[in-house]
Amino acid sequence: MAQASACIDVAVSADIVWQLIGGFNSLPPWLPYIPKSETTEGGRVRHLANPNGGTIVERLEKFDNAARSYSYSIIQAPFPIADYLATISVHQKAGGSGCLVDWSATFIAKGVSDSEASKLFQGTFEDGLKALAARFAPSRRVGLSAHSVQ
């Protein structure tokens, strides 16, 4: 099983960040490479358009508004992976001085090495979190890791 994860400091409260990213259909306002998102199945499935005209279909697996977190799986995508499960969460920092946003996923690489698949999502998560932080203030730190677990 392969994995990728990223974390970034954002200089505003967790509640403010969650207002922007906490909806399962809320990617286009903050994620530049997803210009369009439409939901089906009562909002539990989202169909994402990417700039190349491709479609990614994702299913909401778990949503916890109080914890500011949701998990989703990929149903259909042009990526070399299977059994993808990701979580996005927002955590208030102690003292109320901003928040941490975490985005992580586990998956099985298909037709490529675990490292290659991890790099794909590592870049996606890093770029996405940088774009998110830029909406509020310059980012102070991006910590990113990608791991392959045999």
Identify the residue ranges that each predicted region occupies:
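A structural signal for well-ordered alpha-helical scaffolds and beta->alpha junctions
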Residues: 14, 53, 122-125
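Short acidic/glycine-enriched loop/turn segments that link adjacent beta-strands
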Residues: 42-44, 67
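Short aromatic-glycine motifs in intrinsically disordered, low-complexity regions
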Residues: 44-51
